[in-house]
Amino acid sequence: MNTLELSARVLECGAMRHTPAGLPALELLLVHESEVVEAGHPRRVELTISAVALGDLALLLADTPLGTEMQVQGFLAPARKDSVKVKLHLQQARRIAGSMGRDPLVG
């Protein structure tokens, strides 16, 4: 299984581009902050992760303001072939109510 669900804030939102197959593609940099319990002890988690949205979801996210809080779901894949770095491939994204974004999104 390769599924990741995360609450995150949009730190960067790139310009719309298209894949060689002609699909709209949007690169984002997301930041996540949370506190979890690991081995019975609280642990603060702060991370940034590169993400990409393709197709209709890319079009929906293209005007997302920086700082928008979202719930995202997708899968992890290598950033490039044979790379040890990973990228989150978004399959769903929902703006969190009260965030800087306008309407909730569902991909």
Curated annotation (Swiss-Prot):
Protein role: Involved in the restart of stalled replication forks, which reloads the replicative helicase on sites other than the origin of replication; the PriA-PriB pathway is the major replication restart pathway. During primosome assembly it facilitates complex formation between PriA and DnaT on DNA; stabilizes PriA on DNA. Stimulates the DNA unwinding activity of PriA helicase.
UniProt-listed HAMAP family: PriB (MF_00720)
GO terms under cellular component: primosome complex
Domain of life: Bacteria
Family in the record: Belongs to the PriB family.
Keyword GTP-binding found: no
SSB domain: residues covered: 1-97
Name of this protein: Replication restart protein PriB
Organism placement in taxonomy: Bacteria, Pseudomonadati, Pseudomonadota, Betaproteobacteria, Burkholderiales
This protein's UniProt keywords: DNA replication, DNA-binding, Primosome
Tagged with keyword Lipid metabolism: no
Alphabetized Gene3D superfamilies for the sequence: Nucleic acid-binding proteins
Molecular-function GO terms, alphabetical: single-stranded DNA binding
Listed GO biological process terms: DNA replication, synthesis of primer
Assembly: Homodimer. Interacts with PriA and DnaT. Component of the replication restart primosome. Primosome assembly occurs via a 'hand-off' mechanism. PriA binds to replication forks, subsequently PriB then DnaT bind; DnaT then displaces ssDNA to generate the helicase loading substrate.
